[in-house]
Every structure is written in C-alpha cells, then in structure tokens.
From Swiss-Prot:
GO terms for molecular function: 6,7-dimethyl-8-ribityllumazine synthase activity. Gene3D superfamilies: Lumazine/riboflavin synthase. GO terms for biological process: riboflavin biosynthetic process. Pathway: Cofactor biosynthesis; riboflavin biosynthesis; riboflavin from 2-hydroxy-3-oxobutyl phosphate and 5-amino-6-(D-ribitylamino)uracil: step 1/2. Belongs to the DMRL synthase family. (2S)-2-hydroxy-3-oxobutyl phosphate binds at S87, T88, R129. It catalyses: (2S)-2-hydroxy-3-oxobutyl phosphate + 5-amino-6-(D-ribitylamino)uracil = 6,7-dimethyl-8-(1-D-ribityl)lumazine + phosphate + 2 H2O + H(+). Its EC number is 2.5.1.78. It comes from Chlorobaculum parvum (strain DSM 263 / NCIMB 8327) (Chlorobium vibrioforme subsp. thiosulfatophilum). This is 6,7-dimethyl-8-ribityllumazine synthase.
C-alpha cells in the first residue's frame, strides 16, 4: 500500500485573484499589495488577472471579500491590511472580528481566501512585515492563495 499525497502547486497561470485591501494605514497596505502582485507575477500569473479592491478599514474586509468572492469573478481572494495596537481595546475587537469574518467567508464560499492582515504592536513591526526585515506578508498571502487554488483543483 502506498500513501497518496495531495499538494497544491505554485503556478499562478490562469488564476483570477481578488486582492481586498483596507485603506487604513495605506502606506503600509500598498506595500502588501505590491508584494502580493510580485508573488503572483513571479509564479506565472498575469496582471490582467489581478483586481485590487479597496475598502475603508479592516472591519470591512470580511463583507467586501464575501461580496467579491460570491461574484464568480475570482478563483482566490487575498485579504490585506494593517491593524496596529493603540491605547484602547479597539485593536482587539477589530483584529478578532476581521480574522473571524475572513475565515467565515472562506468556509461559506469555498473559495481559497488567505489572510495577509498585519496585526502588530507598533508601526515599526508593521513596516518590518511589509517588505523589510520580516519579508512581505502580502507576498506570503499570495503564495498561499496560489497553492490553495491548485490544491482545491486536485481535490475536485
């Protein structure tokens, strides 16, 4: 008996991507978008198959992602944004609700949805994760989306 392994490949050719990005902390969010686009193109995807959708903030990411995912225009959704802790409990509420909501959209739509939303203690950590010391989490989220689309295809 031989164990069967099923894995997604890392080729983006022909995949239609929706990138949903929150505008709050946009100077960092834009770096995440650039990282995601770079990843898709490096893995054989076309800029013609990438749509960037901007929403006001992280709290709106789940509903906008759901609407876009249900449109039938996309094979994968990549959520991007930046939530930085402040001096009030607002961070905890927004981070938790955005995370839960985005996960729920993936389960409801059965379209691969990846989470590239930074949740950091401070601005420096966010900048580090948007293309400096800690890589680019937009790139990482796009890579996950590519793999998941191909995995879903194999699973039927």
């Amino acid at each position: 008996m031989q164990v069967q392994n099923i894995e997604g490949t890392l080729t983006a050719q022909g995949i239609r991507f929706g990138l949903v990005v929150s505008r709050f902390n946009d100077f960092i969010g834009q770096k995440l978008v650039e990282g995601a686009i770079d990843c898709i193109v490096r893995h054989g995807g076309s800029a013609d198959n990438i749509t960037v959708i901007r929403c006001p903030g992280a709290f709106e990411l789940p509903s906008v992602t759901r609407k876009a995912a249900m449109s039938g225009k996309f094979d994968a959704m990549i959520t991007l944004g930046v939530i930085i802790r402040g001096s009030t409990p607002h961070f905890d509420v927004i981070a938790a609700e955005a995370t839960k909501g985005i996960a729920q959209v993936g389960l409801e739509t059965m379209i691969p949805i990846t989470f590239g939303v930074l949740t950091t203690e401070n601005l420096e950590q966010a900048i580090e994760r948007a293309g400096t010391k800690a890589g680019n989490k937009g790139f990482d989220a796009a890579l996950g989306a590519i793999e998941m689309v191909n995995l879903y295809k194999q699973l039927g």
